[in-house]
Amino acid sequence: MGRDTIADIITSIRNVDMNRKGTVRIESTNMAEKIVKILLREGFIENVRKHQENKKSFLVLTLRHRRNRKGPSPSRTFLNLNLKRISRPGLRVYSNYQKIPRILGGMGIVILSTSRGIMTDREARLEGIGGEILCYIW
């Protein structure tokens, strides 16, 4: 049975977010790099570094946080990041561009795999193409 790399990425980010850690290391694949590029562009993560160890490449992600200005000493709290895998190897979910769901009225994003590559729901609607719904992020 094959590995679901998208589910691995989502689970790693979710676990680090729940434990209030600052960084997460995920295995570097073409799909992972494209998804991380979208997360960086949309502002869900702060920084990405490529790290090589024993001929294997990893991506080191720094999660976004906001400063808490209340209280005597300013502290940092991480954004509560919610990720949900939709299409999976056992049950693929497809949508045309007119029926792509809006997450929180457009506040969240849907990541799709289309014939023109991995893109967000807004980009897919603008280009008028549908595809496989990979995950929701809000």
Curated annotation (Swiss-Prot):
It is found in: Plastid, Chloroplast. Keywords: Chloroplast, Plastid, Ribonucleoprotein, Ribosomal protein, RNA-binding, rRNA-binding. One of its GO terms (biological process) is translation. InterPro entries: Ribosomal_uS8, Ribosomal_uS8_CS, Ribosomal_uS8_sf. Pfam families: Ribosomal_S8. GO terms for molecular function: rRNA binding; structural constituent of ribosome. Coiled coil: none annotated. GO terms for cellular component: chloroplast; ribonucleoprotein complex; ribosome. NCBIfam families: PRK00136.1. HAMAP family: Ribosomal_uS8_B. One of the primary rRNA binding proteins, it binds directly to 16S rRNA central domain where it helps coordinate assembly of the platform of the 30S subunit. Belongs to the universal ribosomal protein uS8 family. Part of the 30S ribosomal subunit. This is Small ribosomal subunit protein uS8c. It comes from Oenothera elata subsp. hookeri. The gene is rps8.
